């Protein structure tokens, strides 16, 4: 197989290198193209079909070389619809892989897999481009120090902390606050870490992608008046796109994130929604290319494809890419090859609970189901670890007692169990938090809570010092001092009512 240089050879203009082939066969999004002898393109090269269809309408289709078939023929996968293409049409080899715009000019904009803006705001003002196929950072470039990525969200930082440069799986159904949590993380990384975010919508519903964009504009994550001050770049490959586009859109988003890490030396947050759709698109392409399917009909190269994406998401000595990936689990089967392969790469899981959302506790992160490999005494320290374990024990005991309370009532519990329930209910409410991006809906100012403040707050609840305060004082507050202030205000209000 011919390897692909990511840039043109020195001293030779790209125009001189371009070779022209002709379409031989079209099967859906797969094109077979014949090139002159000695002019075959490299694997992963971008090919462009520019022509006019029978209605004299302009055709502009970009493809990516996937296989060299022999007899001067290559097989390529189209990145857009192939309607209007005919056998015999000219195909130009660009001589390089797909390259996309990178840098500060991408912030606040929406792109497709080819790096073309699709938000009707005109061309992107940047000359810098990166190829989407790049090697993972070398071992000597990696930052091996284990460090916590502070999000300012109490429940995450205390019970399932994120690793700087790690990968987090976000599990949640519709309507439990996934989008708001994503937007808050984008907002917090910009304010606390001076970082930026890249959102990759892989196989998303177009409606959801549009809703996310509108909500980001409403909450200020995307600044309409001054687009350069936006904190996020969006890359969409929706459900209606051909499988080639859905398979590569994750790499386009990752490439934009790599520029911020390697060139701007920033901490970057990369969202991929949904990582399952990346695997699904790869499976479709694999079948179209005639490969023999593997377990459950997935592509035989599943682990390799997943690894080539995930290994590029890491911390280097320059900066970090921390990735949050929404994971769809088909038929709730965790042993399915797609989620099973994803789990092997994750450092933490954040599980959103419909039960907590129905109680009005936001963020609705399940404190018992969410896990993290970072929650170890040698990484987070003994104080953090012990506080987190005691919080989990208290909540677990409350969960066990709920059936008894439902049948017999709270009065039938022992004094010790009643105290546990009271503290658990305070903890549950203190895990809620007002978000900056939700200010426009709730009217409550958002709060960023540092890790030390979070630990101090839960220690005070567990020690019993705050047993006299009412439960509602802990609901939707930032640090523990706000809870104490809220308790005084509630007491004064109740006196006035009397």
Curated annotation (Swiss-Prot):
PANTHER family: ATP SYNTHASE (PTHR15184), ATP SYNTHASE SUBUNIT BETA, MITOCHONDRIAL (PTHR15184:SF71). It is a peripheral membrane protein. Its main location: plastid. This is ATP synthase subunit beta, chloroplastic. HAMAP family: ATP_synth_beta_bact. The lineage of its organism: Eukaryota, Viridiplantae, Streptophyta, Embryophyta, Tracheophyta. The gene is atpB. PROSITE patterns: ATPASE_ALPHA_BETA. It comes from Zea mays (Maize). One of its GO terms (biological process) is proton motive force-driven mitochondrial ATP synthesis.
């Amino acid at each position: 197989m011919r390897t692909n240089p990511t840039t043109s050879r020195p001293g030779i203009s790209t125009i001189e290198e371009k070779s022209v082939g002709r379409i031989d066969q079209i099967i859906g999004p797969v094109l077979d193209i014949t090139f002159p002898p000695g002019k075959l393109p490299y694997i992963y090269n971008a090919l462009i079909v520019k022509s006019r269809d029978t209605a004299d309408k302009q055709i502009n289709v970009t493809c990516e070389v996937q296989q060299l078939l022999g007899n001067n023929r290559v097989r390529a996968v189209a990145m857009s619809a192939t309607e209007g293409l005919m056998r015999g049409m000219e195909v130009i080899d660009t001589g390089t892989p797909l390259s996309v715009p990178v840098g500060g000019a991408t912030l606040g904009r929406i792109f497709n897999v080819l790096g073309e803006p699709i938000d009707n705001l005109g061309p992107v003002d940047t000359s810098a481009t990166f190829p989407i196929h790049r090697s993972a950072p070398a071992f000597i470039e990696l930052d091996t120090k284990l460090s916590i990525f502070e999000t300012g969200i109490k429940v995450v930082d205390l019970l399932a902390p994120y690793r700087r440069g790690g990968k987090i799986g976000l599990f949640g159904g519709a309507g439990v606050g996934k989008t708001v949590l994503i937007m808050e993380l984008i907002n917090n990384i910009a304010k606390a870490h001076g970082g930026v975010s890249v959102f990759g919508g892989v196989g998303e519903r177009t409606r959801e992608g549009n809703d996310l964009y509108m909500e980001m504009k409403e909450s200020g994550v995307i600044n309409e008046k001054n687009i350069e001050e936006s904190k996020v770049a969006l890359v969409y490959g929706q459900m209606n796109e051909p499988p080639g586009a859905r398979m590569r859109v994750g790499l386009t988003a990752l490439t934009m994130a790599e520029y911020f890490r390697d060139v701007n030396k920033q901490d970057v947050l990369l969202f991929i929604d949904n990582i399952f759709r990346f695997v699904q698109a790869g499976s479709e392409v694999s079948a179209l290319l005639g490969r023999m399917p593997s377990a459950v009909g997935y592509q035989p190269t599943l682990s390799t494809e997943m690894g080539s994406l995930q290994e590029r998401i890491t911390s280097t000595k320059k900066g970090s890419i921390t990735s949050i990936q929404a994971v769809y689990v088909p038929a709730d089967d965790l042993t399915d090859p797609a989620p099973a392969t994803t789990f092997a790469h994750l450092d933490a899981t954040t599980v959103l609970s419909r039960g907590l959302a129905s109680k009005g506790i936001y963020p609705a992160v399940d404190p018992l189901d969410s896990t993290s490999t970072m929650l170890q005494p040698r990484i987070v320290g003994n104080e953090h670890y012990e506080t987190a374990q005691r919080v989990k024990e208290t909540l677990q005991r409350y969960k066990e007692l709920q059936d008894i309370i439902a049948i017999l009532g709270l009065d039938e519990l022992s004094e010790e169990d009643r105290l546990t329930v009271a503290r658990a209910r305070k903890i549950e409410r203190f895990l809620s938090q007002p978000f900056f991006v939700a200010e426009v809906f709730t009217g409550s100012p958002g709060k960023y809570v540092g890790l030390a403040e979070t630990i101090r707050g839960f220690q005070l609840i567990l020690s019993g010092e705050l047993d006299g305060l009412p439960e509602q004082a802990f609901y939707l507050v930032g640090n523990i001092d706000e809870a104490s202030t809220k308790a005084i205000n509630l007491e004064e209000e109740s006196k006035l009512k009397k």
